[in-house]
Amino acid sequence: MRAKDHNRSIDADWLSRAFCYEDSVVKPLRYFCLALALLPCMAHAAPELNVGGLYDYLEEGKSTLLKRVRNGGDSTAFVKVSVVELVYDGSAAPREVPLDGLALEQRGLVVSPARLIVPARGMQAVRLLYRGERDKERYYRLRFIPVLPELGDGFAVSEAEAEQYRDSLKAGVNLLAGYGTLLFVRPDQTRYETPIRRQGGALTVTNQGNATVVLDHFRQCQAQDQVCEPATKHHLLPGRTRKFEGQAAKVHQFELQEGSERKAMVLEG
């Protein structure tokens, strides 16, 4: 199914670009820190991060969110957390505004701690605190990047400990994988209004509210829950319209998510 983009709507393609480490990497945002290959016969202990969901939503009236970072590997993970604000001003791609170099009082979103030491088979948590204005919806990208610790880089390890850790990873061909997640900060007085129209097989969805809506498990089927295409997920920002082509003999089926509300949608015509 081919989708036409109207008014530069934000969808999974935009989110892929927003998450990319180098504007060409798509989910799950693998970041090669040491090597390009991992040979099973040469594999040694290495960290394996799991940051949970790639999308988080800070609803109206809430200012904090706890995000858990798990390490399923056999080696301790030293993780740096970086934050950029994604400013969508009508261009083809969002503009990135780094927050890491700003003074604490100038940051709309504060991540604490910004350095994590996650033990093997263990878990640590980061606290997201939003302190900025909520006159409109705002968007932030967080990067969780495993690194080789160095003296004085905030991990409070000695030079000998850092060298020992580096040597343990260099013993084989290892891969350190980093991940990016996206945070949606809802505005005050959040309002949802999402008219949906289907005609001649084409589905048109418009977001007339002031917060992003999600079309989850989106697919076209021969009939409800029968012979369906692979499901996709689309985020539609306020003021945007998205048109999906389709066949009149088939149905569009998805879950419309407006904040905490969920609506099962099956559309014909």
Predicted features and spans:
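Short acidic, flexible loop segments centered on an aromatic residue
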Residues: 79-103, 145, 210-225
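Terminal connector regions
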Residues: 131-190, 252-269
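N-terminal signal peptide c-region/cleavage motif recognized by signal peptidases
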Residues: 40-42
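Intrinsically disordered, low-complexity Pro/Gly/Ser/Thr-rich segments with frequent PxxP/GP/PP motifs
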Residues: 99-133, 226-251
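Intrinsically disordered, low-complexity segments enriched in serine, threonine, and glycine
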Residues: 193, 197-269
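Beta-sheet-dominated interaction scaffolds and their linkers
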Residues: 46-75, 189-198, 233
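Asparagine-centered strand-capping/turn motif at beta-strand->loop junctions
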Residues: 69-73, 130, 203-211
